[in-house]
Structure formats: structure tokens, C-alpha cells
Amino acid sequence: MDDFERRRELRRQKREEMRLEAERIAYQRNDDDEEEAARERRRRARQERLRQKQEEESLGQVTDQVEVNAQNSVPDEEAKTTTTNTQVEGDDEAAFLERLARREERRQKRLQEALERQKEFDPTITDASLSLPSRRMQNDTAENETTEKEEKSESRQERYEIEETETVTKSYQKNDWRDAEENKKEDKEKEEEEEEKPKRGSIGENQVEVMVEEKTTESQEETVVMSLKNGQISSEEPKQEEEREQGSDEISHHEKMEEEDKERAEAERARLEAEERERIKAEQDKKIADERARIEAEEKAAAQERERREAEERERMREEEKRAAEERQRIKEEEKRAAEERQRIKEEEKRAAEERQRIKEEEKRAAEERQRARAEEEEKAKVEEQKRNKQLEEKKHAMQETKIKGEKVEQKIEGKWVNEKKAQEDKLQTAVLKKQGEEKGTKVQAKREKLQEDKPTFKKEEIKDEKIKKDKEPKEEVKSFMDRKKGFTEVKSQNGEFMTHKLKHTENTFSRPGGRASVDTKEAEGAPQVEAGKRLEELRRRRGETESEEFEKLKQKQQEAALELEELKKKREERRKVLEEEEQRRKQEEADRKLREEEEKRRLKEEIERRRAEAAEKRQKMPEDGLSDDKKPFKCFTPKGSSLKIEERAEFLNKSVQKSSGVKSTHQAAIVSKIDSRLEQYTSAIEGTKSAKPTKPAASDLPVPAEGVRNIKSMWEKGNVFSSPTAAGTPNKETAGLKVGVSSRINEWLTKTPDGNKSPAPKPSDLRPGDVSSKRNLWEKQSVDKVTSPTKV
């Protein structure tokens, strides 16, 4: 017993270790080397099982040896039989373990298939959800199934979780089976001890037939051994017969107990199967209920999601409209700024035109001023020329007179005196001429500066005028000198400079001192001319530099004005392009918005058409009664029982009533006659029943309670029209009193009884739109389908 307890404790510890290992594995799913770890664990489990098996076999052999040693009187034949039985039992145990392994493999396969079938209905089920008690129960129910030979296959172990579950399950089942077998073995040993059997045989685990045969053989051998040991060998036949009878009774007793065990096992198996079926059925019902609840929750979530999307779409449309309004406002502001910019450019152009006009007027005034100044200068020059000519003539006349007088005096005395006098007169004359030239130059310079201040753009003309004047002045001076000195010749160089006059020998012969005096006089006369030429050149150079600078400034201003104009043109072109792009983008956005609206309308129309088609198909699929039209009882049709013909009639009547409000009275009379013809068609159906009419939803053109219409619409959208009863809507005020005597009133109205409330067909002059609608309501509340179809809701 101590050895048995030790083995059981070892098995319990091993199960605990395997359970802990399985729990640890369940939390280590992210291991990089999962396959290697699983393979190593399986290898260790196989080694552990083999080791336990060898230990059990060795322990069984040791137990047998101890029992044999305890029986000192047993002969060698009994020892041989025991050894042979032990070997046979070991082979049987190996075969039995193999059969159990195959049976367990088949059971695991069936369990896996069942789990896969359950996964098809509920994906949330996993292999790890199978509890240990259910596994043990399935093990007990699967042990009695038919055995088939199949090879072990480890190729199925693809998923890590399935592999670990199978390993742990097999270990648990094998340990449970061993515990059960050991318990049975203990019970059998106790029974044998109670029956006073001296020897306990090694019984094969879970083999009922082999165990019975072995017990019979052992009991017979024990009887023989005991007789040999005590030396009481008797050859009496009655005693042997008693022993045989006792053995047969014992065998029958064992058989009876085995049958009872079998019956109890069958009953237990049947009970377990029934419980399993009940459990599976309950689980299936629970799954179906959960699935239904999940579907309803999903539908509810989908409806909420749809409402949310619609709200988001409405919000988005509002945002887009707001952005479009802001964009339009921005475009208006930009257009306003562009208009202001154009106005500013026009004003600038206007100012530029005024400036050009002012410049032209100033140029014109400057030209007139120059013309006037030129005329004045010409007049002054003429007056001065006349004065100079007169003075020169006077001087010439005086010189001629002096010359004539000097010829008459003696050459030496008179010549000297005349030369001195001439030199003095020449000096005086040159001083006077120099003074006059300086005064003229000062006047001309002042006029030139004044003209330059008035308008610097016309310097070239002034320069030409001054050149002409300067050219005239030296010529006049030279002429005066030539008139006075006939011996000088006028020489002008190509660059406009005046050279000193070369002297010619006169015919009259003077003395030597007289010749030197004439040379000094000529040099004194040429010096002022050279100085005047230098000053003239300096003035010309300065005037040219000033004119070139002013001309460059004017050219630079013109270029700047041209650049500014180009920039303005570029800005205007860019602004125009921006406006065109904005306009193009706005048009594109408008087109996109229209396309989206068209797409939304088309989608809604397709959805409505689809719902109409589905409703029509559902109405057509409904079973029709086999009764004829004459035998059919009157029945209140609701939207779930309406037909296409009645729907078409209701649409026709609605259209006719809508048209009747704007047409002539003759047309109204025709509508009334059509209503009468429709009423006659339903007379037979109305007369066939006496039952009260349940309230109906009103027609689409009549006052309809909003809640009833909303309920009907929601039922048609959800598809519950044919499964759930329709909610009774609030009755109209017009139909409040039409619940009992409606059919009799309609019959009286149709038969044109004189005491009816209203005439069936009044004249067109008496007809009013209210009469038509009220009469229509009378028969429409009792007709087959007076409400709008679900497609109109």
C-alpha cells in the first residue's frame, strides 16, 4: 500500500506540474521558438511516460517476487505459472494501452471536428474554452465506442494552442484512467481477501474477460498448492466435486457481478449521454439567443451609425455652404479691391496725361520765349552793329585824314609822332572793344542761364544761337580791325578758332622805329582775341556738360516711368489671372456640388425603387386564399396585405382628387361618376360582412397622424411588416363615427334613397371639392386598400 500511495502521489505531482506548465505556456504566446519548445515538451512527456511505464512494470515484478517468496510451500510449477502470467499481463497491458491511445486520438479528432463546427456558428469559441470536467465526461463516454486501427499522426499539430491542449488533455485522461484502474484493483483485492483467498493475482487493467479466466486458473492452482503444502492429499471424489461446485459458484457470482457492473456502466453512460445532449442543446439554444441578441445589437448599432453619418453629412453640407458663402464674400471683396485698383490706375493715367499736357504747354511757352528772346537779340545786335559800323567809319575817316596830314610833314618827325598817336588810339579802341565784348558776354550768359532755368530740354537750339552770335562778334571785330589795318588777312581754322592775322608790307615806306611800333600794335590787338576764344571754348564745354547731364536725367526718368508702367501692367495681368482662376475654381466647385447632389438623388431613388421591388416581391410571395371572390369574406387590408391592383387604384384616385381642385365642375362630375363605379365594385365585399372595421391609416392626401406613418415606414424599412402586427393609428375625425352603420349608409347612398344625407350624383353647379373628398372618405375607409403603399410613405 505504501508503494501504491507513493505512485499515486507521484502521479498527482506530475499532473500538477503539467497543469502549471500548461498555464505558463498559455501566457507565453510570443515566444520566438515556440515549435522547438513544443517539440521538446512532447519529447520529455514521451520519455516520462516510458519511464513511468517501466517503473510500474518493475514494481509489478517486484511485487510478484515478494508474493512468491512469501509462499514457501508453493512448488516450482506455481512460480513458472506466475512468471508466465506476468509476461502475458505485460503484453496485454501494452496492447490495451495502445488501444486506449488510438481511442483517445479518435476522440480528440471528433472533439476537434465538433469544435470546428461550433466555430462556424460562433467564432468566439476557442479550444481552450473546453473545461477539464467536460473533457473527463467525454473521455468516459468515448471509451465504449467502437475501436478502429489508425496510425498516429503528428502532422495535425499545426496550431500551438491545439498541440498544448491535446498534450495536457491526454496526460490528464491517462492519469485519471490509471487512478480508476488502481481503485478497481484495490476493490478487487479487498473482495478476494474477504473471500479468504491466500494469493492476490496480478490482474490486467480494465480487461474483464482475461481477469475472469485468470481468477479461475489462480483459484484452482491455489487449491492444489494448499493441498500439497499441508500434505492432506485426498482422493475423495465428493470433496473434489464440492470444490468444483464452489469454483463454479464463484465463477457465476463473478459473472453476475460483471453483468451488474456492465448494466450500471450502460445506465451511467446513457445518463451521461442524455446529460451531454441536454447540455449541447442548452448551449445551442444559448448560442442562438446570443446570436439573435448580437444581430439585434448590430442592427441597432448600424441604425445609430447611419443616423450619425447622416448628421455628419448634414453638418458637412452646412460647413460647405458656409465656406462657399465665405468664398463668395472673399471674391466680392477681391473684385471690389480690383475695381479700386483699376480706378486708381485710371486716375494715375489721367494724372500722367495731365502732366504730359502741362509739359507740352511749358515747352510751347519756352519755345515762344526763345523766339521772342531771339528776335530781341537780333534787333539789339543790328543796333550794335550799326553803332560799331558808324564808329569804325568815323575812326577810318579820322585815320585817313591823319594819314594825309602825316604825309605832308617830314618823314622822321611826323612819322614818329603819328605812330605814337596811332598806338594810343589803338589802345583806347581795343580797351573800348574789350569792355563792350565783356558786357555783351555778361548779358548773353544771363539770358542763357534764364533760359536754362525755364526749360533745360532745348539747350541745343540756344547753343546754336549763341554760336552764331559769337561767330558774328569776332567777325565784326576782325572786320573793324581789317578796315583799320588793311594789311591784315582773316584766317579761320577748321575747329572755329581764330588765328592771329599775318601782316603785309605796305607800299608806303616808314622808318625803322615806325615798323617796330606797328608790330607791337598788332601783338597787343591779337592778345584779347585769344583770351576771348578761350573763354568761349570754356563756356561751350561747360554748356555741353550741363546739357548732357540734364539729358541723361531726362532719359533716366523716362526709363523709370516705362518700368513703372510695365509693373502696373504686370500687376493688372496677374490680378486678372487670379480672378479668372478663382472664377474657374468656383465653377468647378459648383459643378462638383451638383454632381454630388445628382448622385445622392440617384442613390435615394435607387434605394426607394429597391424597397418597392422588395415589398412587391413579399406581397406576391404571400399565400393567396383558394376561395373565389364571391365567397371571400370582407377583410380589412392593411399595408402588409395590399396588392398591386389596389395600390394602382389608390394612386389613380389620389391623382384624380388632386387634379379636381383646379379643374372645371364638369370634370368634377366625371370624377364623382368614377367614384360611383369604384364603389359598385366593392359593394359585394361590403355586404358580405357585419364586423366592425379596425382603424386604418389615412390616405396620403388626407390628414394623417405622423406617428402612424412613421411606424409603418419603420416597419417597412426593417422588414418586420409580415412578422409583427401593425400598430393601430389614431383615427381621423372624419371616420370617428363610421364604425357600425357605415355599410348601410353606403348601400342607401348607392341605391339613391331619398332620405340619404347627400345625393349620390349632384349637378355640377352644386358640386364642391369638399363633397367629393367627404364621399371619397366614406367608401375609402371601408375599401380594400385606401392607405398609401409603403413606397409612398
From Swiss-Prot:
InterPro entries: Caldesmon, Caldesmon_LSP. Coiled coil: none annotated. The keyword Methyltransferase does not apply. Residues 564-621, 664-674 are annotated as: Tropomyosin-binding. There is a cross-link at K459, K645 (Glycyl lysine isopeptide (Lys-Gly) (interchain with G-Cter in SUMO2)). GO terms for cellular component: actin cap; actin cytoskeleton; cytoskeleton; cytosol; myofibril; plasma membrane; stress fiber. In non-muscle cells, phosphorylation by CDK1 during mitosis causes caldesmon to dissociate from microfilaments. Phosphorylation reduces caldesmon binding to actin, myosin, and calmodulin as well as its inhibition of actomyosin ATPase activity. Phosphorylation also occurs in both quiescent and dividing smooth muscle cells with similar effects on the interaction with actin and calmodulin and on microfilaments reorganization. CDK1-mediated phosphorylation promotes Schwann cell migration during peripheral nerve regeneration. Keywords: Actin-binding, Calmodulin-binding, Cytoplasm, Cytoskeleton, Isopeptide bond, Muscle protein, Phosphoprotein, Repeat, Ubl conjugation. Sequence repeats lie at residues 319-332, 333-346, 347-360. The modification Phosphothreonine is found at T730, T753. Residues 60-74, 721-733 have a biased composition (Polar residues). Actin- and myosin-binding protein implicated in the regulation of actomyosin interactions in smooth muscle and nonmuscle cells (could act as a bridge between myosin and actin filaments). Stimulates actin binding of tropomyosin which increases the stabilization of actin filament structure. In muscle tissues, inhibits the actomyosin ATPase by binding to F-actin. This inhibition is attenuated by calcium-calmodulin and is potentiated by tropomyosin. Interacts with actin, myosin, two molecules of tropomyosin and with calmodulin. This is Caldesmon. The gene is CALD1.
